[in-house]
A protein has these predicted regions:
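Internal intein/HINT superfamily modules and their associated LAGLIDADG
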Residues: 1-264
Length: 264
């Protein structure tokens, strides 16, 4: 399972998000992935990638969201296969906070696409704006996407857990989302068909005439803060820094009211 091969990197990312390794007595155990039956083709693709016997089955049962839900289940019992996955970073049992990108060299693009297919979203908001997001409890996973997103699009994201459930929701919107999904979901890549279709639809979005992108977030430094505090007027500071007077006014207010720390 060479993770520099995009298909294996994708599969591993998907398994980290939606797979479950279970250990039994002795050397017994299994890898199990259960997803909606509409996405069963991805499990058959995993089956073809895996040189060990495995099965794809289905079941229908009631859930909290529907009276009947049909799912597809991929089951792999090989000890050698489970050992390989475990050593690469797929732990036994509960894993949401402990998973992390592999320590070996791997295809980041394939790996992140697998995570987004399993635990992310690609599409349009209720207002028709394109977006791509990933929900994860793992700091390492969230950091990996933020780093890749910066490399691919130039957009920076700060890591912050939701106060309600302690989960990270890394979100990209508008042109940045278009750029990122175009990079991740290239023609012929292994992916969920519905996510690939959604990614393709984002490419057709065009910003309304007269609507301008938000300016990039300002990264304030100690030198910039000192200039803000010592400049004779906000207008002087704005002209010196090259930012709007309103942005400089807000930052100065935060400095004077201890909302952010004063420069060293």
């Amino acid at each position: 399972m060479d993770l520099m091969v995009p298909e294996y990197a994708y599969m591993f990312g998907f398994l980290q998000a939606d797979g479950h390794l279970k250990q039994g007595p002795g050397q017994k155990g299994q890898l199990r992935v259960e997803i909606s039956a509409r996405d069963a083709e991805i499990l058959r693709a995993f089956q073809k990638l895996t040189p060990y016997y495995s099965s794809v089955t289905g079941r229908t049962r009631p859930t909290n969201f529907a009276e009947t839900h049909t799912s597809a289940i991929w089951t792999l019992c090989s000890l050698e296969a489970r050992t390989t996955l475990n050593e690469l970073g797929l732990p036994y049992g509960r894993k949401s906070k402990t998973i992390a990108p592999p320590d070996v060299e791997f295809s980041r693009r394939g790996y992140l696409r697998g995570l987004i297919d399993a635990d992310g979203s690609v599409g349009f908001t209720s207002k028709g704006f394109p977006f791509v997001s990933l929900t994860t409890a793992s700091t390492a996973i969230a950091s990996c996407l933020c780093d890749y997103g910066k490399d691919a699009t130039g957009a920076e994201r700060s890591l912050k857990r939701n106060t309600r459930d302690g989960i990270y929701n890394v979100l990209y919107m508008m042109e940045v989302a278009q750029c990122l999904v175009a990079d991740l979901y290239y023609p012929g890549c292994l992916s969920l068909e519905r996510k690939h279709s959604a990614a393709a639809s984002l490419a057709a979005w065009v910003r309304h005439a007269g609507s301008k992108p938000k300016p990039p977030r300002i990264k304030w430094t100690n030198d910039m803060d000192r200039l803000l505090l010592t400049a004779p007027t906000i207008a002087n500071a704005a002209a010196e820094l090259g930012y709007s007077s309103s942005a400089c006014q807000v930052r100065r207010w935060k400095l004077l009211h201890d909302v952010v720390p004063l420069p060293d």
